[in-house]
Amino acid sequence: MDTELLKTFLEVSRTRHFGRAAEALYLTQSAVSFRIRQLENQLGVNLFTRHRNNIRLTTAGEKLLPYAETLMNTWQAARKEVAHTSRHNEFSIGASASLWECMLNAWLGRLYQLQEPQSGLQFEARIAQRQSLVKQLHERQLDLLITTEAPKMDEFSSQLLGHFTLALYCSSPARKKSELNYLRLEWGPDFQQHETGLIAADEVPVLTTSSAELARQQLSALNGCSWLPVNWANEKGGLHTVADSATLSRPLYAIWLQNSDKYSLICDLLKTDVLDEQ
């Protein structure tokens, strides 16, 4: 039996709502419904009664519940034990491409410099979209997530690392927003609400990317402008702030599982400033 089906069953039984279960599992509501139908077809019984928004376990569902919990707990324990034997000296850090390029690459270098030679700690720098990394963290496939928005989930702990400043940059001086094409750089799911007030409502980006370096390299060719971290842009050189634009401050968070077995290591690593001179 697919453990993902049991996981979905447990989440629906906990929330009694397909929409909320979908949000918790980072799935669409139709995918959750499909998984429940698959499980019901495999077992040959209905697991839930559905009357509008009133979702309840059937008698068969009530009987399955303790077995599903036991199976999932056993599976999680097995995964954790197997993973521990193969990666006890490994530590995975996940973030978007832009965060790695603009600030985390330097932080990783400082971490290596501060490591004791005998520690044998091996880092994995993982690049992906925030939603994918949150799912990996939830499933214990990732140790630490660095992001601009803290997930609103009880099983996560977070630490505010500080703030960094974004400004709207282009490749030549004294340019206005109306003269430039917009290159959208993804700075987190809540950035769009800030972006809307700083960019014309009808502005359609000619390029959308998660890489600050790619956006920077395309500014001249596309006669464009993009939101870039001020310190990083100054280090790169050759960039100019758009004349009629403002600046924007963004938070940076470290996120980890509350019951992470690497909590002590996480605390030690976060003693090294991530936003060095940002």
From Swiss-Prot:
Q: Where is the HTH lysR-type domain?
A: 1-58
Stored Pfam families: HTH_1 (PF00126), LysR_substrate (PF03466)
* SUPFAM superfamilies for this protein: Periplasmic binding protein-like II (SSF53850), Winged helix' DNA-binding domain (SSF46785)
DNA-binding region as annotated in the record: 18-37
Q: Does the keyword Transcription regulation apply?
A: yes
Chain segments annotated as transmembrane:
none
Q: Name one GO molecular function term.
A: DNA binding
Keywords, in A-Z order: DNA-binding, Repressor, Transcription, Transcription regulation
Q: Which domain of life is it from?
A: Bacteria
Example GO biological process:
regulation of DNA-templated transcription
Q: Which InterPro entries match?
A: LTTR, LysR_subst-bd, Tscrpt_reg_HTH_HdfR, Tscrpt_reg_HTH_LysR, WH-like_DNA-bd_sf, WH_DNA-bd_sf
What function is annotated for this protein? Negatively regulates the transcription of the flagellar master operon flhDC by binding to the upstream region of the operon.
Question: Which PANTHER family does the annotation name?
Answer: HTH-TYPE TRANSCRIPTIONAL REGULATOR HDFR (PTHR30579:SF8), TRANSCRIPTIONAL REGULATOR (PTHR30579)
Task: Identify its protein family.
Answer: Belongs to the LysR transcriptional regulatory family.
Listed name of the protein? HTH-type transcriptional regulator HdfR
Q: Which gene encodes it?
A: hdfR
